C-alpha cells in the first residue's frame, strides 16, 4: 500500500536533461537547498503579459496521467501532480510528508491483536472534482481498492497495494471480489488495514496517505464501490462484480488515462487539451479547487506544456516559444542561460541541488551484464571524473552509490562512505583483470584470448543458467561474446558523450568488449526496461545497458521490494535491474529490513541499515552512478513568487507564482 497510496519513491527517467551535479554539497537537513536566483532588471511596469505560462520540458509526454500506476515518466508525473492534489498526506517544501488539512479532517491508527494495523481516515465535507461532483470516502476507497483487483494485474499496475492491505491478496488473485481491509465507515470516513508483516514501518504515518479517483470516469458509467460489512467491492449498476481486464472497463480506463478533454480530477489545474502527436498539454485553473495543504490556490490561469528541444531551447525562450525551462543540467546549457541573462534577457535563473543522480542502468538478466565482473569493468573503462567535468563544466560531482548529496543520510555518512565504497576509478588494467577473473578468457573459436587482435572476449556459459542470446556453439560448449546491447534515447547529450567516452572508446575495444548502441524514443526505453511492448505484451529481454536518471520526489528513502524475486511484483515493474540478491545481507534483505525492522523515529538504526545497503549495492553495481547535479530553471522576470528546490518542483512551485502584469 505504501508505494500505491503515497508513491514514496518515483524512478524518474529523464531524457536529454539527464545530466550532472554540483561540486558543493547540499543541506544537512532532509529539506532541500533553497533555490537561488540571478536576475536581470525587472521589465517595464507598462508591459502586459497574458496570464499564461508555457513550460518547456525535455521529457516526452506519453499520456499516462495515472500518477505512476502504469508508467512513471517524469513529465507525465508532473501533469498528474498538477491535476491531482487531494491526498490526505502530501509532501511539503522539504520533501517531508505532512497532513493536508484542506482534505483531512482527522485520522488515527489502531494496532490490532493479530499484528495488523488499521488506519481510520475522515475527510472534510464539501470537496469536489473539477466537474463539480462531490468527493466522498468512496472515491478514496476506490483508488485503493482498484489496485487489489485482477484488473490491476491485467493492466500491469505498478502498485503492490494488494501485498499490504488486509485481504488484498485474495481479491487480487480473484478468489474473492472484495477487500476486507478497506472499509467504508460513513460517507466521509474510510479505514485501511495493513497486514502484520508490513504494519511495522519506518514511515508508518504514510499509510494514512490516500487520494481520490472518480469511479465512473475511470471505469465507465454505472461503476461504483460498496461495502456491506465484509469489505469494499466494485459494483456495476449496483451489482457486485469481479473486476478483470479485457472488457469495457479496461477500454474506458485506457481512454481515461490521457483523455483529451473531460479529464475528471481534483487538483489546482484541469487538462483542457492534450495532443499526443506534438506531446503538448494545456491546463487551466480548476475553479473548484479548495487549495493545497497550506490553502494556496493558483493565480496563473493557463499552463501549456511543450517539448523543449536541445538544439533550439534558447531560441524558444527568446521568442516566447516557452517561458519557463525547468531542470537544465547540461553545463553548456547552464552557461548559455547565464550568458542570456547577462545579455539582458528578461530571465532569472533558479539553481537548486538535485535530489537524484544520472546513471547507466544495467539489466542483469540478459547478456554479459548478468555478470558482476562485467559491470565492474564497464565502470572502470569510463573516466567518470572527466565525464562530469566535460558535461557539467563545474556544476557536477561524481557519486558512487544511489544517493544524492543533499540527503541527510549522505551528510551523516561521508566518512563512512569514503572508507567503505569502491570508486571504480578509470583503470583499464583493473577492468581487464576483472574480465579475466570473471572467465572472459576465450575467443570465438574457444582459444585463449590474449589481446584485442583476437577480437571480442568470450565466456564459457555452458553450465550456467543464464540468458544465452547471441551465444555461439563451439565443440559442444556455449560461448557468450562480450557484446553489450545499449539502448539510449534520441537527442540526448548524455548518450552522445557516453558514445564518445565509453562505447566507442579505444579502451573498450582493447579490452575485448563491444558496446552496441541503439537509439530510439521514450516508449522504446520503457519497453527495454519492462520487457513489454507498447500494448503491454511481454517481449524477450534484449538490452543489458541503458542510460537515464533516478530522482526522489520526497525525503523518504525506501527501496523495499525493488530487489524482489516475486514474479508477480517483477511483472509489475519492481526490480527493474533484474538483479536477484536474496541471501541474508543481500539487497532484498537490507532494503526490506531498513524500513520494516526499524521503529519510526529510530534514525540511528535506520542509518546503520542504510549504510549496509549502500555498501552492498556498491559491491554488486547494478548501475553506474554518473553524477549528482545542480538543476537550473529559467523563469521570466515578470513572474513573481516562483521558488523551486530539490523536492519542490514546477507543479508545486507554480501555485505560489503570479504574473502581476497579467492582463
Residue ranges and their predicted role:
Residues 56-114:
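N-terminal lobe/hinge region of extracytoplasmic solute-binding protein
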Residues 92-93, 206-298, 302, 312, ...:
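Gly/Pro-rich hinge or "lid" segments in bacterial periplasmic/extracellular proteins
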Residues 105-160, 185, 191-193, 316, ...:
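Aromatic- and charge-enriched surface segment that lines or borders ligand/interaction sites
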Residues 153-157, 163-164, 272-287, 304-366, ...:
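Extracellular/periplasmic solute-recognition and catalytic clefts
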Residues 157-245:
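Surface-exposed binding/hinge segments that line
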Residues 199, 203-205, 389-392, 440-490, ...:
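Bilobed periplasmic-binding protein-like "clamshell/Venus-flytrap" ligand-binding domains
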Residues 282-284, 371-506:
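Append "and occasionally in soluble cytosolic enzymes with long acidic Gly/Pro-rich linkers
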Residues 381-416, 497-505, 533-663:
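Detector for C-terminal structural segments
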Amino acid at each position: 500500500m505504501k508505494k500505491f497510496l503515497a508513491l514514496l519513491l518515483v524512478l524518474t527517467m529523464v531524457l536529454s536533461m539527464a545530466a550532472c551535479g554540483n561540486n558543493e554539497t547540499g543541506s544537512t537537513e532532509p529539506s532541500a537547498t533553497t533555490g537561488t536566483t540571478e536576475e536581470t532588471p525587472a521589465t517595464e511596469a507598462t508591459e502586459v503579459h497574458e496570464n499564461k505560462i508555457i513550460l518547456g520540458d525535455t521529457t516526452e509526454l506519453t499520456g499516462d496521467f495515472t500518477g505512476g500506476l502504469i508508467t512513471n515518466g517524469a513529465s507525465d508525473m508532473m501533469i498528474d501532480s498538477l491535476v491531482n492534489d487531494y491526498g490526505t498526506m502530501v509532501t511539503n517544501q522539504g520533501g517531508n510528508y505532512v497532513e493536508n488539512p484542506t482534505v483531512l479532517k482527522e485520522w488515527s491508527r489502531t494496532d490490532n491483536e493479530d499484528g495488523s494495523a488499521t488506519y481510520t481516515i475522515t475527510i472534510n465535507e464539501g470537496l469536489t472534482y473539477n466537474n463539480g461532483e462531490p468527493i466522498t470516502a468512496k472515491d478514496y476507497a476506490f483508488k485503493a481498492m482498484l489496485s487489489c483487483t485482477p484488473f490491476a494485474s491485467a493492466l500491469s499496475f505498478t502498485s503492490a497495494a494488494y501485498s499490504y492491505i488486509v485481504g488484498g491478496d485474495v481479491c487480487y488473485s480473484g478468489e474473492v471480489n472484495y477487500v476486507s481491509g478497506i472499509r467504508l465507515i460513513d460517507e466521509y470516513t474510510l479505514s485501511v488495514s495493513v497486514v502484520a508483516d508490513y504494519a511495522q514501518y519506518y514511515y508508518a504515518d504514510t499509510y494514512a496517505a490516500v487520494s481520490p479517483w472518480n469511479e465512473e470516469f475511470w471505469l465507465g458509467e454505472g461503476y461504483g464501490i460498496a461495502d456491506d460489512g465484509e469489505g469494499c467491492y466494485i459494483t456495476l449498476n449496483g451489482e457486485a462484480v469481479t473486476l478483470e481486464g479485457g472488457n469495457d472497463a479496461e477500454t474506458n480506463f485506457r481512454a481515461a488515462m490521457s483523455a483529451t478533454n473531460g479529464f475528471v480530477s481534483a487538483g489546482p489545474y484541469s487538462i483542457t487539451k492534450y495532443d499526443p502527436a506534438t506531446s503538448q498539454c494545456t491546463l487551466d485553473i480548476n475553479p473548484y479547487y479548495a487549495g493545497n495543504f497550506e490553502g494556496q490556490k493558483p493565480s496563473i490561469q493557463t499552463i501549456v506544456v511543450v517539448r523543449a528541444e536541445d538544439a533550439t531551447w534558447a531560441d524558444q525562450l527568446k521568442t516566447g516559444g516557452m517561458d519557463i525551462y525547468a531542470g537544465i543540467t547540461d553545463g553548456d546549457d547552464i552557461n548559455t542561460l547565464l550568458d542570456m541573462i547577462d545579455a539582458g534577457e528578461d530571465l532569472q535563473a533558479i539553481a537548486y541541488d538535485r535530489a537524484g543522480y544520472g546513471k547507466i542502468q544495467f539489466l542483469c538478466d540478459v547478456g554479459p551484464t548478468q555478470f558482476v565482473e562485467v559491470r565492474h569493468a564497464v565502470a572502470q573503462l569510463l573516466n567518470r571524473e572527466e565525464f562530469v567535468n566535460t558535461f557539467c563544466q563545474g556544476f557536477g560531482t561524481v557519486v558512487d552509490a544511489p544517493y544524492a548529496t543533499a540527503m541527510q543520510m549522505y551528510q551523516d555518512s561521508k566518512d563512512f562512505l569514503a572508507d567503505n565504497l569502491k570508486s571504480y576509478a578509470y583503470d583499464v588494467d583493473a577492468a581487464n583483470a576483472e574480465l579475466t577473473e570473471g572467465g572472459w578468457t576465450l575467443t570465438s573459436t574457444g582459444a585463449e584470448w590474449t589481446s584485442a587482435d583476437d577480437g571480442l572476449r568470450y565466456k564459457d556459459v555452458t553450465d550456467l543458467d543464464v540468458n544465452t542470446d547471441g551465444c555461439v556453439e563451439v565443440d559442444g560448449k556455449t560461448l557468450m561474446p562480450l557484446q553489450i546491447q545499449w539502448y539510449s534515447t534520441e537527442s540526448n547529450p548524455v548518450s552522445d558523450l557516453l558514445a564518445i567516452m565509453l562505447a566507442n572508446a579505444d579502451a573498450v575495444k582493447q579490452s575485448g568488449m563491444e558496446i552496441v548502441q541503439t537509439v530510439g524514443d521514450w516508449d522504446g526505453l520503457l519497453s527495454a526496461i519492462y520487457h513489454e511492448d507498447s500494448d503491454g505484451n511481454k517481449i524477450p529481454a534484449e538490452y543489458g545497458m541503458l542510460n537515464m536518471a533516478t530522482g526522489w520526489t520526497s525525503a523518504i528513502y525506501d527501496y523495499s521490494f525493488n530487489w524482489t524475486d516475486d514474479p508477480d511484483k517483477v511483472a509489475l515493474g519492481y526490480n527493474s535491474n533484474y538483479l536477484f540478491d536474496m541471501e541474508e545481507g543481500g539487497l532484498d534483505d537490507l532494503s526490506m529490513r531498513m524500513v520494516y525492522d526499524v521503529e519510526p523515529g529510530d534514525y540511528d538504526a535506520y542509518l546503520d541499515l542504510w549504510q549496509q545497503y549502500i555498501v552492498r549495492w556498491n559491491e554488486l553495481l547494478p548501475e553506474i552512478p554518473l553524477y549528482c547535479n545542480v538543476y537550473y530553471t529559467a523563469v521570466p522576470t515578470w513572474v513573481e513568487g516562483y521558488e523551486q528546490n530539490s523536492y519542490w518542483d514546477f507543479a508545486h512551485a507554480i501555485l505560489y507564482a503570479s504574473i502581476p502584469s497579467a492582463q
